[in-house]
A protein has these predicted regions:
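PDZ-domain C-terminal substructure recognizer with occasional recognition of PDZ-binding tails
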Residues: 145-148, 163, 175, 179, ...
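Catalytic-loop region of hydrolases
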Residues: 2-15, 27-144, 233-258, 374, ...
Length: 537
């Protein structure tokens, strides 16, 4: 669940925090006793010299030492939380936040969010940023087992071979002489119909293997030997699921989700086995105890919390566990209080669909018809872009949804719609080529962004969600949901359930305890503020 930070929205929320700063305590029913820790642990906060040019000016940098496992806090195992603190003039207390995710970095977001705080908030409250476990400068990174690596980029789709879209400099493929535009026809005597065949062949190899690659260059057949290298996978996942469904035509969702579940389970199992001292300890149950340890280490009896998107799950769990530690809380883009893996996955396509309906109304009324034409066209055709890549309905759905995550990106979204529409409907070849050229640039930018997000956040996203929510979705349940979602929202929508349902192969008993949840009342001194806005994704 991604949080989008915009100046207007942040200004509105922090003005709410400023208002709360002056609210007399509204006394609710007596709060339940604070849940005791299993054993006492004295958190330590160690300050260090901040990197040059750190912002805002005067920020303090620190590491908080906490137990690896709050269920056994005195077993001697610890980890560290990366912290930033900007002290206030009046020192009335602290305000902390989480920007969303799971996987969002509070340290990275710290300067930008601080710059938008109202002056009265800055004057009264210390501002505190931190990276949750597994994120940024905090401990418990997920490192995957060594995976086979050749450094090939492949054009999606195809049927007469796998076209190379590029090679990573210095990679085994580059050293062997393969270049962009080569079309791989065989690997070790096996016929390659498309890029997926090549990926499967590489996955079956081990570092050090020799792969004999036959390919076409300028129509002439050639052959090279590629020595398979290795790379730390970092428990890396695809942008949503390991493989796309068919590029065109009807989708057998039962077959797709079973294949996806098998692939995801293999990744999850390997990642968990490779990280016995980190993967089981990433859940929000652990994070809220880190958060309360940070409060204690900074000397606040209570403090203020602002959660965005996934950060509201942290806020809800913290409030339910430590209600007497909160002075005021703002839930910005709140998740449900009683989440499930099934609910998280199946609600995502509907939420994305709502943003698709709001986009034309807010930014481009003429785009609605064009979007419909594009989706209908892509259901039957793969668009060949001028940069040598292809755009499928799955690419379009994910890339366009990414653009709608922030209204500041609406102009780019409008350009994507207009130019792709022109590329498939314009009257002349020149007009179509011009439209596809612009669409290709936008598509490549979004493709790179989604790949970067997957590399940086997907593993933490999966392990936090699967630790927090202990129900497990089956491929059959996803298939049944997909059929309904497809009828209501279009063929491309069910695919977006993937990462939110990616708990295959992760038994709850091997992970952190589930978050406290439920619909029972949480009694706080100051009533919480919930902030929602149209167009949230």
């Amino acid at each position: 669940v991604r949080s989008t930070l915009t100046a207007r929205r942040i200004a509105g929320v922090v003005c709410t925090i400023a208002l709360l700063a002056g609210v007399a305590g509204v006394v609710a029913p007596a709060a339940p006793a604070v849940a005791p820790l299993a054993e006492a642990f004295e958190p330590t906060l160690s300050y260090f010299k901040c990197p040059p040019k750190s912002l805002p000016v005067g920020v303090q940098c620190a590491k908080l030492t906490v137990p690896l496992d709050w269920q056994n806090p005195s077993d001697g195992r610890t980890t560290t939380i990366d912290v930033r603190v900007k002290r206030s003039k009046e020192g009335k207390g602290g305000l902390t936040f989480n920007p969303g995710g799971p996987g969002g970095s509070g340290v990275e977001a710290f300067p930008g969010v601080y710059s938008l705080l109202p002056d009265d908030v800055v004057a009264k409250f210390d501002f505190v940023g931190w990276d949750p476990r597994g994120v940024g400068g905090s401990g418990l990174k997920l490192a995957g087992p060594a995976q086979p690596f050749v450094g090939l980029g492949l054009v999606p789709g195809g049927s007469g071979g796998a076209e190379i879209s590029g090679t990573k400099p210095g990679s085994p493929a580059a050293k062997a002489g393969l270049v962009k535009g080569d079309i791989i026809t065989k690997v070790s005597d096996r016929v390659m119909s498309n890029g997926a065949d090549v990926v499967a062949e590489v996955r079956e190899s081990v570092p050090g293997d020799s792969l004999v690659v036959e390919f076409l260059r300028g129509g002439a057949s050639r052959e090279v030997t590629v020595i398979v290298g290795s790379v730390d996978s970092g428990c890396q996942y695809g942008t949503v699921a390991p493989a796309y469904p068919p590029a065109t035509g009807p989708v057998d969702w039962q077959v797709y989700w079973q294949q996806a579940a098998d692939q995801i389970a293999a990744i999850n199992t390997a990642c968990l086995a490779a990280n016995p001292d980190s993967a089981p300890y990433l859940g929000t149950w652990q994070v809220i105890r880190d958060l309360d340890a940070l409060r204690a280490a900074l000397g606040y009896s209570t403090w203020n919390y602002w959660g965005m998107s996934y950060g509201t799950r942290i806020g809800h769990a913290y409030a339910r566990t430590f209600p007497n530690r909160l002075r005021a809380v703002v839930m910005d883009g709140s998740l449900p209080s009683a989440e499930t893996t099934y609910g998280l996955a199946t609600s995502f396509p509907a939420n994305a669909w709502v943003s698709l309906q709001l986009f034309p109304a807010l930014a481009a009324p003429a785009a609605a018809r064009k979007m419909t034409v594009i989706e209908e066209y892509l259901n039957g055709t793969v668009v060949a872009l001028p940069d040598g890549t292809e755009l499928t309905r799955w690419d379009w759905a994910e890339q366009f949804r990414s653009l709608l995550g922030s209204q500041s990106q609406y102009p780019t979204a409008v350009a994507f719609v207009n130019n792709l529409y022109a590329g498939i409907t314009a009257a002349t070849p020149a007009e179509r080529a011009k439209g596809l050229e612009v669409a290709a640039m936008i598509s490549e930018s979004q493709r790179a962004l989604l790949e970067e997000q997957a590399l940086e956040m997907a593993a933490v996203f999966v392990f936090v969600n699967c630790s927090d929510l202990h129900d497990r979705v089956t491929p059959s349940e996803l298939a049944a949901a997909s059929e309904s979602i497809e009828r209501n929202y279009g063929t491309a929508r069910p695919y977006s359930m993937g990462l939110n349902a990616a708990c295959f192969g992760l038994p709850p008993e091997d992970l952190s305890p589930a978050i406290p949840s439920g619909s029972s009342m949480i009694a706080l001194k100051t009533p919480p503020v919930f902030v929602l806005s149209s167009g949230d994704t």
